[in-house]
Amino acid sequence: MAPAMEYSTQNGQGEGKKRASVLAIGTTNPEHFILQEDYPDFYFRNTNSEHMTELKEKFKRICVKSHIRKRHFYLTEEILKENQGIATYGAGSLDARQRILETEVPKLGQEAALKAIAEWGQPISKITHVVFATTSGFMMPGADYVITRLLGLNRTVRRVMLYNQGCFAGGTALRVAKDLAENNEGARVLVVCAENTAMTFHAPNESHLDVIVGQAMFSDGAAALIIGACPDVASGERAVFNILSASQTIVPGSDGAITAHFYEMGMSYFLKEDVIPLFRDNIAAVMEEAFSPLGVSDWNSLFYSIHPGGRGIIDGVAGNLGIKDENLVATRHVLGEYGNMGSACVMFILDELRKSSKVNGKPTTGDGKEFGCLIGLGPGLTVEAVVLQSVPILQ
């Protein structure tokens, strides 16, 4: 199958080094979605919390300020009625959550993977590695094994499973895939990030207000990428983005700023008030280290895929770096149309970037710019910085 979009054969090779490239992207969401303006009623009604009127008003204000228009979910009103433990704060519902996630997470990942494979246009037998990331449940063998079987991949496929890394895991998965692609001749790596909020859905509770912050943002989605070095142009492979470097940094002084723990009630997360300033005040050092080899210091000369962990985080990071709104359109679009899908978000943004660049007549997949940065943000606090190079679009 021919690629849906035509790109240059540029593959980022230089100075004798094989560079990994993104060769295809696929994304998907559950069909069920809820408009953000309707979510407070849905949430409080289905958790039998309508009597908590003051908390509901607070939740409404959080939703309004989120700049999210809609979110997609596996959990529907019917499913919540059938699983009252999930909708009851503190109830022992881990078994019910796991039953959902063990099936639905690989299934959603499979849907995204099939889209990426179709765009790639190569035989599925060429996939040599799988990297699967999720913070939605856990099992043995893992979701990496299940999706390998669902897709009918070779039994010799080499798998990496990244469980419970949190929202920065999209960057982690790309970093691992880059190393695999560049250090294994002919490797083609299927990267899958799939998230389902069944593990973190909780009823509101006055003594744990972090819950309602997450309920106003988190959502379900999956993204898949094919990563490889030296695209086989003769067979129709084309780079979408080139991956120049990838790094991970623990933010100093951030221990305990975002944590999550598993209980009989599922996964419960805890947020400190200084999350935004910690990311904001430390992002410049990360960017300087990532881009100094390229001699880049003008942050507005780049395109961006910033994990949309919330409007405040985007505003904080962008404000510190002086990034103009025009360079954040794709990031804010994904936040608005999908919410925070955890590890999958940054890949949705890459997909939006290359598609909007084509629609708007830009010369490259990076909104007309040559270099860009994918920024994963999450627990630790941890920052993943993936330096990308766009490729020319053949108009």
UniProtKB/Swiss-Prot annotation:
Enzyme Commission designation: 2.3.1.220, 2.3.1.151
GO biological process: benzoyl-CoA metabolic process; malonyl-CoA metabolic process; polyketide biosynthetic process
Reactions performed catalytically: benzoyl-CoA + 3 malonyl-CoA + 2 H(+) = 2,4,6-trihydroxybenzophenone + 3 CO2 + 4 CoA; 3-hydroxybenzoyl-CoA + 3 malonyl-CoA + 2 H(+) = 2,3',4,6-tetrahydroxybenzophenone + 3 CO2 + 4 CoA
Coiled-coil intervals, chain numbering: none
Temperature profile: Optimum temperature is 35 degrees Celsius.
UniProt xrefs under SUPFAM superfamilies: Thiolase-like
Residues forming the catalytic site: 167
Class of enzymatic activity (EC top level): transferase
Stored PANTHER family: CHALCONE SYNTHASE, HYDROXYMETHYLGLUTARYL-COA SYNTHASE
Function: Type III polyketide synthase involved in the biosynthesis of benzophenones and xanthones. The preferred substrate is benzoyl-CoA, but can also use 3-hydroxybenzoyl-CoA with a lower activity.
Family: Belongs to the thiolase-like superfamily. Chalcone/stilbene synthases family.
Protein name per its UniProtKB record: 2,4,6-trihydroxybenzophenone synthase
Species: Hypericum androsaemum (Tutsan)
